[in-house]
Amino acid sequence: MRWRDRYGLRRRRGPKVAKFDREATDADIEALIAFARSRRGVEFYVEPETFATDTTAVAVADDGEWTRRRVGSPAVIHKVARDLALPVYDVQLTGYPPRMRAYNERRRREEGGL
């Protein structure tokens, strides 16, 4: 079974008003799943659709490492999170976790940035 079938990416969601730079793909979902399976303490944060991009999800690990991918709709990442038994949050309600910012800051210092 393809990921799109399983997670609802192929369902018609009515006429599209906006044309995104690209739609969510199987590879996007698979990347989030691989990230979640290879790290400890992963949580998903759903970001809303914008004029430029489709709905995205940010997976944040326990150490603050993170990745962002398109997911098509919040329902898709909710299904993925349920299957992996991981929490999912709406970033507009909760914001990003402090460990994500701390990770970004550590990376900047390691790379010699400001």
Predicted regions and their residues:
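Intrinsic disorder
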Residues: M1-L114
